[in-house]
């Protein structure tokens, strides 16, 4: 096994970005949706959809990202995840369309299943004697 412990800071940054993707937009989202959506019921629907979309897609696509990391390697899958999250962080800042923002949350959630890949990377970097 090659020594991959040098990549641990990269892994921690990937996990941090995944976690930021969940909650970073929460303080801004009510104002953003309130400016675009009309009624309170529409605002509530859009807020709920945007908050659920990220977590649901993360839950659904984590096994897929894990399988891809087994096939193509951990680092390429993690880099793909960072790219997808970068798009997700950028789109709400530039868009005035709720469906586009919702799509960015869905896309971000699809790419944010990197926690499982990060755990596999750490497992690869740890020798059997030091595993729990």
Q: How would you name each of these model-derived features?
A:
Residues 3-35, 106:
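Pair of pore-lining "gating" transmembrane helices in MFS-fold secondary transporters
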Residues 4-8, 91-104:
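Helix-loop junctions at membrane interfaces in 12-TM secondary transporters
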Residues 14, 50, 78-88, 104, ...:
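Residue-level signature of the transmembrane alpha-helical cores
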Residues 32-37, 71, 121-126:
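Helix-to-coil boundary motifs at intracellular loop junctions of multi-pass secondary transporters
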Residues 59-99:
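Conserved MFS/SLC helix-loop-helix module at the cytosolic interface between two early adjacent transmembrane helices
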Residues 103-132:
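Cytoplasmic helix-loop-helix junction between adjacent transmembrane helices
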């Amino acid at each position: 096994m090659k020594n991959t412990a040098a990549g641990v800071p990269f892994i921690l940054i990937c996990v941090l970005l995944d976690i930021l993707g969940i909650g970073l937009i929460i303080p801004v989202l009510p104002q953003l949706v309130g400016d675009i959506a009309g009624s309170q019921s529409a605002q509530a629907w859009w807020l709920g959809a945007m908050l659920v979309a990220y977590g649901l897609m993360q839950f659904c696509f984590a096994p897929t990202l894990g399988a891809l990391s087994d096939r193509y390697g951990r680092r390429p899958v993690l880099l793909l995840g960072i790219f997808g999250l970068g798009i997700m962080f950028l789109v709400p800042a530039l868009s005035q369309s709720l469906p586009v923002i919702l799509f960015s949350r869905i896309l971000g959630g699809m790419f944010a299943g990197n926690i499982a890949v990060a755990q596999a990377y750490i497992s690869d970097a740890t020798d059997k004697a030091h595993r729990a």
